[in-house]
Amino acid sequence: MAAPISEKMGITTPKDSIDRLPEDPEKVENTETTTDEEVIVPPVNNGETQQRWNESTTNLFRFFSTIYAFILMGMTDGAIGALLPYIERYYSISYTVVSLVFLSPFIGYLLAALLNNLIHHYFGQVGIAVLGPLCRLVGILPLVFHPPYPALPVVLLFTGFGNGIEDSAWNAWVGNMHNANELLGFLHGAYGLGATIGPLIATAMVTKGNLDWWYFYYVMLGLDAVALVLLTGAFWRATAKVYREQFLDATGGKRTTTRTVLKNPITWLLALFLLGYVGAEVSLGGWIVTFMLKVRHVEEFWAGLSVTFFWLGLTVGRVVLGFVTGKMGEKLAISIYLLLSVAMQILYWLVPNFAASVTFATFLGFFLGPLFPAAIVAATKLLPSDYHVSAIGFAAAFGGGGAALFPFAVGAIAQSKGVEVLQPFCLAMLIFILLMWWMLPGGHSRGGLERARENGEKVGDGFRRVGRRVLARSKGAEA
């Protein structure tokens, strides 16, 4: 018996995201006259038909293939920080110039944010499965030939685009499954695992194997070639035709434009939250080694090991706290994790001891771990179901740009002020994303996000409620 189309596509929506908002004037009824900016949206399903990661061999294959893809994405992002001092030394360049290896992928992530839905529409999920690894291969291949430095930022545009479209697509797919908090915890834990072993392998190759920095990318070439085969095989039947047929059957031809999704303030709030979060995470991961060498004055191997412990803490946090977050409620849990992260960041900054620094960095990674998965779950609970693929895809890819933008900013400032600027910079970013999180609709009790959608709460309502209470109490005190 042939598998239903919904099983082939793998995009469903949570039960609490079924109720649709009033019809948007941007909706277009006639599919033949829609423009390229308009994107297919996933069908509306009830909670009983939510996909499970293990409901079929197809889903099992696809889920574990995305896990492997996230491991490679983590290795790519994590290793660059460990190799940064050696790239700087090899090319004899400044902090600002070497930081361009962080900035250039931002353009790739931005393009991924804008094109994610069009790729789904014209090529389906199999298009993502092919383009993601292929773009990473195009970006990595020149690195093994250690070309002149100006070529590095250019080729890394491709890795940014490949990571961006996979990041957005697989987040949207897994984020709409049953037990999304836990599954996204494993998915992003895989990224953390890659970011843990990537620097470890790279550091060992350079410091213990006496190899030049570019030899690490021979390893990545082989691993990404495997990813191309795995993902293409896993999503081979998830074509554009399947994607469009599922949509037309479920919605009668209605489509939601990208412009409409971007007019919703929640989309931008989550995108800014992820931009700041990923920026803080990768700034720490990218500059810890240099910070330990220049400020804590430790040996190269131990400096490389410190970033491994940071990513290890992040990996464990994503997996372990993923089971806690859903039980506490996303709004409360992430608020607690962020406050603890701020405390760890301050201690990491102010305690000038190597062992203490590694300990605080590890716990900082642990509490930062579940933030990205929780933001994806929040999107599925606060936004209409037909916004999910577009909004999550945009927020994830736009947020991924933080991995390029903010580490570059740290490097540019460090050129004149020293790498010590890493700590106050990351502290400011953590406070910023905490404020962004508190601006989301919904209270801090469990189920607050769901009730916020049911009650039609708006962005910043929590701050307004607190302001009214403070004002009322001050008036009462005066009386």
Predicted regions and their residues:
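Helix-breaking motifs and short loop linkers at transmembrane-helix boundaries and internal kinks
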Residues: S92, G124, F145-P150, H297, ...
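Intracellular juxtamembrane helix-capping segments at the cytosolic ends
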Residues: G164-H178, P370-P384
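Extracytoplasmic gate region of multi-pass secondary transporters
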Residues: I80-G81, N264-V316
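Cytosolic juxtamembrane N-terminal segment immediately preceding the first transmembrane helix
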Residues: A2-A69, M73, T256-T260
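Conserved MFS/SLC helix-loop-helix module at the cytosolic interface between two early adjacent transmembrane helices
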Residues: L111-P150
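Helix-loop-helix hairpin linking two adjacent transmembrane segments in secondary transporters
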Residues: A180, F186-V242
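Helix-to-loop junctions at the C-terminal end of transmembrane segments
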Residues: A112-Q125, G317-E330, A414
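C-terminal transmembrane helical hairpin of 12-TM major facilitator-type secondary transporters
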Residues: M328-A375
